[in-house]
Amino acid sequence: MNQEQETKLVIITGMSGAGKTVAIQSFEDLGYYCVDNLPPALLPKFLDLMKDATNNIQKVALVMDLRGREFFDSLFEALDVLAKENWLEDHILFLDAKDEALVTRYKETRRSHPLATDGLPLDGIKQEREILDELRGRAQRIIDTTSLKPRNLREKILKVYKEEKQEVFSVHFVSFGFKYGLPIDADLVFDVRFLPNPHYVSNLQPLTGLNPDVSSYVFKWSDTQTFIDKVTDLLTFMLPQYKKEGKSQLVVAIGCTGGQHRSVALAEHFSKVLSNGYTTHVSHRDIDKRKVL
């Protein structure tokens, strides 16, 4: 590979039960194209596809989950090829944990270790640790997850691998009409049907909350301003808590009767207000439904 290749590669490997599933989910939140359990023999071919400029894939994370020595041999062959092509400057992440912690995790999940004989996880763990010892030595980064909860592991990965100024947590405001049902993906729902309805103002009825005349009408009422102040205070308090708990996205739904006027104007407003501290998005689920009814 030439030096102009911009694709960033992270290979996630390590002990079974050490947190590879949490790790790959964390890389997904960072915008990586993720593949779980790619056979090592397919790794060079897969990366050849990544070289195709039309893919426009700049960040790739792969979980290499070894299930036997035959995979181990083919993985090292693949790593040797990648090293010659300058893929692996700082891209092998090895997740580890003490035997006692791994045994406890397998007991809690009631799953068997992939290399265990007679269902005894410790036997499989010892065998896997022996197989992976050399690979562990080649890793550029090792994370011991013994004392880490899934949330802590995610935070650690985000801290290490996120790009400068990259914001992982985002807030999506969506307007909707109650007559069409609640958004199924909403985390928080606010009902603004108590506010004066532009639908009953003849010159505003055919417009939407995206129109300045409609938004001015919605915002001119004291109840609207009180609602905005209280919701802004609530979100200012809650968003850092959701972020701290490890959520990558919060969906805030704002509903009025038909999803045309009040909810649209307010969703736009909150998206702009909160954009000072967060990555925000706004969409209007039902804004076009009146046209087809």
Swiss-Prot record:
Chain's role: Displays ATPase and GTPase activities.
HAMAP family in alphabetical order: RapZ_like (MF_00636)
Similarity comment text for this entry: Belongs to the RapZ-like family.
Database matches in Gene3D superfamilies: P-loop containing nucleotide triphosphate hydrolases
Protein name: Nucleotide-binding protein OB2468
Classification lineage: Bacteria, Bacillati, Bacillota, Bacilli, Bacillales
Positions that bind GTP: 65-68
Annotated residues for binding of ATP: 14-21
Gene Ontology MF term list: ATP binding; GTP binding
